[in-house]
Design a protein with these regions (language model features):
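Phosphate- and other anionic-substrate recognition elements at nucleic-acid/protein interfaces
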Residues: 2-11, 15-100
């Protein structure tokens, strides 16, 4: 049985910027990508990433405490992938990640 490679797009959502990383599961390689400004062009810019990398899966980090604006914006971003593009999204608990 051969192992099939998957491409994963990881997002560190923020109300001003969204951190982005791409990963390949077969080799375990990861690559940070340029930060996306979270403005009116955010979904257009995310679409460009999708066209370039064609990920199989999207990971979105979920922080332990969120403001209402943060929660609403993150929900819109998740819905963009799930409802608009029919992509699988996994939310990752950030409770025990480091803080800067």
């Amino acid at each position: 049985m051969s192992k099939q490679a998957k491409v994963v797009l990881s997002l560190d959502y923020g109300t001003k910027n969204i951190g982005v990383c791409i990963a390949e599961t077969y080799t375990g390689q990861t690559q940070p990508l340029p930060v996306i400004t979270n403005n009116k062009s955010v979904f257009e810019n995310l679409n460009k990433l999708l066209e370039t990398w064609r990920p199989n899966l999207v990971l979105i980090g979920i922080p332990p405490k969120m403001s209402e604006d943060f929660r609403d914006g993150m929900a819109r971003t998740k819905n963009f992938f799930v409802k608009d593009l029919n992509m699988k999204v996994i939310e990752v608990n950030e409770d025990y990640t480091t803080q800067g």
